[in-house]
Design a protein with these regions (language model features):
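Extended recognition/assembly regions associated with phosphoester-bond processing machinery
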Residues: 1-77, 81-211
């Protein structure tokens, strides 16, 4: 196992990172999906105990990846938010992150939890719900009609691995689609219904494992 795994997608060298992100070196761009900022706050508000983590931990992971890869942009493939923006505790952490990384471009595709972003004032590049970026079609959900190789999220693919209890987030590589694992730790997941030729790459204990 290693911290990252290089794969060629649509003729481009792409790095699958153990932090559940995809790095495009030629564009210095990180892709993540299903960040769900604010979800941990909602759980705690309703008295649901959670392990350590949440917004601060997720933003720290992004900052670490930016420093390690030299990325100049981070694009979120939908579900940047989870819940309302007003008075959200996570917003303080987000504003501190943007202050420390003011030169970093943060782009967001619209996901099913992102309706409030238009008026949010979060220093984001709002990309709409579909972007053609070089050979890639960026979407929140898989789209078999897209003209390019699809990069997306929404599915939250997970796998079981013998010898490692629990379920682990995974990249799901198909012939013309790469589904990213959910970046947030506070999401459910499911085992993909794979077809012949599909590949899964699991993220576990800071390493990636091709299955």
């Amino acid at each position: 196992m290693a911290e990252s795994l290089e794969r060629t997608l649509a003729g481009e060298s792409m790095h699958l990172l153990a932090e559940r992100a995809l790095f495009w070196p030629s564009r210095k761009r990180l892709f993540i999906a299903d960040l769900h900022l604010g979800k941990a706050d909602i759980f705690r508000r309703f008295g649901i105990a959670l392990p350590s983590g949440g917004t601060r931990h997720d933003l720290s992971r992004i900052a670490s990846m930016v420093e390690r890869t030299g990325a100049t942009s981070v694009w979120v493939l939908g579900d940047f938010l989870h819940g309302a923006i007003d008075s959200a505790q996570w917003r303080v952490g987000w504003e501190a992150f943007r202050g420390a990384h003011s030169a970093l471009e943060v782009g967001v595709l619209a996901g099913n939890h992102d309706r409030a972003l238009v008026r949010a004032g979060l220093d984001l590049l709002l990309l709409g719900d579909a972007v053609e970026d070089g050979p890639f079609s960026l979407r929140h959900m898989p789209d078999p009609r897209a003209p390019g190789h699809v990069l997306c999220g929404h599915v939250h693919p997970t796998v079981k691995i013998e010898g490692f209890p629990g379920r682990w987030p995974a990249f799901w590589l198909q012939a013309s689609t790469c589904v990213l694992p959910a970046f947030s730790a506070f999401t459910g997941g499911r085992t993909p219904e794979t077809m012949q030729g599909d590949r899964l790459v699991a993220c576990l204990h800071g390493q990636v494992l091709a299955l």
